From Swiss-Prot:
CDD domains xref list: CysRS_core
Cystine bridges: none
Gene: cysS
Keyword Metal-binding set for record: yes
Description of how the protein assembles with itself and partners: Monomer.
InterPro entries cross-referenced by the UniProt entry: Cys-tRNA-ligase, Cys-tRNA-synt_Ia_DALR, Cys-tRNA/MSH_ligase, CysS_C, Rossmann-like_a/b/a_fold, tRNA-synt_1_cat_dom, tRNAsynth_Ia_anticodon-bd
Phylogenetic lineage: Bacteria, Bacillati, Cyanobacteriota, Cyanophyceae, Synechococcales
Protein name: Cysteine--tRNA ligase
Family label: Belongs to the class-I aminoacyl-tRNA synthetase family.
Length: 525
């Protein structure tokens, strides 16, 4: 199995740190998970940079987290035990701006959009991380890292004579004025020229870089020793949200947050550090530079990055104003059609979002759904072991740096073949393939799609939805009644009942889309 390492700019044999020199992977079994060679599954420690929680997720976010969900699932299928960590950046100038616009605290804004994040990702069947650390919960780890960098000569202070907050525990809310005397406090910067390997991840040289590119914290070039230095800690006015620190009142720099959270949750040396290609520089470059002088170890063995999702040739981003929220897309397209669209292109290549491409993905998902139903029909009494030839081809595709386009091509061939066989059986009462071969191909299709993170109703649910629709039971009035019951359950905080109703409707081919104003839209799948 090989993966592309951004650090070395080549594909490398995947060998996790915990595996040593032993063989540690094997072919998946019929239950969708791989049987490891060793009794103890080799551990893969994987960190993915998460969202800054000030707005709804856009389709660029969807691509990132579908990709790394796919990678995680495949590693688990191959027999690894993945410890998957993904952070939330819950202190940031963008969150502060949104909080001031709405007259809320940064914490309230962050909490709301964390909840919205989970709603969106659940629609795409993205597995929950093992840990979701937050920047505001890792302050002590940040302080320790910054102090260590100061002691080793990699960081320096810049005096900032503004009032500071001395309370070591409270988060200052926007507009609150602490009654403390004026004092001196500091910003702390990382000196990039002290780290000889700076630029190794991005392949850039200092003289070619753009000064101030880390601009998450509004750095003023005049106060830095070098224009390329970046903030570890930035002093803040007492009227702004912030934290008490060894350097006075302020907020952490963007990059130190992830370094601290990686170290707290996974240790000094991890297997995979992943994120979007836009994070290679400056974020991941700076993470590496500020972590390795402290630990004396490479921060990650494999640095992995997914390509952009483009609109009209430009990366989708909020800063460019060309983004479509995931919520908007889910109001039009089936979640699994969207997942299919995002995985039909290799994860390192850019994707161009067009209406034609999404319509093609929707038709593709319909093809796969037909194949799934046929596979469920052939396997309804007894599930066979998956077809060996198909599974070997799937593994060969995925072992080559997670080749999902080739893997999905195998799934489409199986789906079409099973649909042909099912149609033949329906009209003529016979099939070309023997029953055992049909079961094996059916099991292969279901296992491949499950490993790639697709989900679908069970056979009984599928048949039940068809029968209900035929009998006229799934009419507009019934749908609206169930939605009203679900809304009442949510208001009563009976979330298990609300989820049961949502799942009941989903099994009947109805997708619910909760709106910002509290109403709920529904779509037939």
């Amino acid at each position: 199995m090989v993966v592309y390492n951004t650090l070395t700019r080549r594909k490398e044999v995947f060998q996790p740190l915990a595996a040593g020199g032993s063989q540690s992977v094997s072919v998946g079994n019929s239950q969708g998970s791989a049987a490891p060679v060793a009794e103890e599954k080799p551990l893969v420690r994987m960190y993915v940079c998460g969202v800054t929680v000030y707005d709804l997720c856009h389709l660029g976010h969807a691509r990132t987290y579908v990709v790394w969900d796919m990678v995680r699932r495949y590693l688990e299928w191959r027999g690894y035990r993945v410890k998957y960590v993904q952070n939330f950046t819950d202190v940031d100038d963008k969150i502060l701006k949104r909080a001031l616009e709405r007259g809320e605290s940064m914490q309230a804004v962050a909490e709301r959009f964390i909840a919205e994040y989970f709603r969106d990702m659940d629609c795409l069947n993205i597995k929950r991380a093992d840990f979701y650390p937050r920047a505001t919960q890792s302050l002590q780890a940040m302080f320790q890292l910054i102090q260590s960098l100061e002691l080793k000569g990699f960081a320096y202070r810049v005096r900032d004579p503004i009032r500071h907050q001395t309370d070591q525990s409270s988060l200052l809310q926007a507009g609150h004025q602490p009654e403390t005397p004026a004092s001196v406090q500091y910003s702390v910067y990382y000196s990039v020229r002290k780290f000889p390997d700076y630029g190794q991840l991005s392949g850039r040289k200092l003289e070619e870089m753009e000064a101030g590119a880390s601009g998450r914290v509004g750095e003023e070039g005049a106060e830095k020793q070098d224009p390329f230095d970046f903030a570890l800690w930035k002093a803040a006015p007492p009227s702004e949200p912030g934290f008490a620190s060894p350097w006075g009142w302020g907020r952490p720099g963007w990059h130190i947050e992830c370094s601290a959270m990686v170290r707290e949750t996974l240790g000094d040396h991890i297997d995979i550090h992943a994120g979007g290609a836009d994070l290679i520089f400056p974020h991941h470059e700076n993470e590496l530079a500020q972590s390795e002088p402290i630990t004396g170890k490479p921060m990650a063995k494999y640095w992995m990055h997914n390509g952009f999702l483009n609109i009209n040739g430009e990366k989708m981003s909020k800063s460019l104003g060309n983004f479509t929220t995931l919520r908007q897309a889910l109001a039009v397209y089936h979640p699994m059609a969207l997942r299919l669209f995002l995985l039909q292109t290799h994860y390192r290549s850019p994707i161009d979002l067009t209406e034609a491409a999404m319509q093609a993905a929707s038709r593709g998902w319909e093809t796969l759904q037909k194949g799934i139903h046929c596979a469920q029909h052939f396997c309804k009494e007894e599930k066979g072991s998956p077809d060996a030839e198909a599974m070997q081809a799937f593994q060969a595709a995925m072992d080559n740096d997670f080749g999902t386009p080739e893997a999905l091509a195998i799934a489409f061939e199986l789906a079409k073949e099973l649909t042909r066989e099912h149609n033949l059986f329906t009209h003529q009462g016979q099939t070309h393939l023997e029953p055992q071969a049909l079961k094996q191909k059916s099991a292969a299709l279901l296992e491949i799609l499950a490993t790639l993170g697709f989900c679908w109703p069970s056979f009984s649910e599928f048949e039940g939805s068809k029968e209900a629709a035929t009998n006229g039971e799934l009419n507009f009035k019934k749908i609206e009644e169930l939605i009203a019951q679900r809304s009442a359950a949510r208001k009563a905080k009976n979330f298990s009942e609300a989820d049961r109703i949502r799942d009941q409707l989903k099994a009947l081919g109805i997708t619910l889309i909760d709106q910002k104003d509290g109403t709920t839209r529904w779509l037939r799948e």
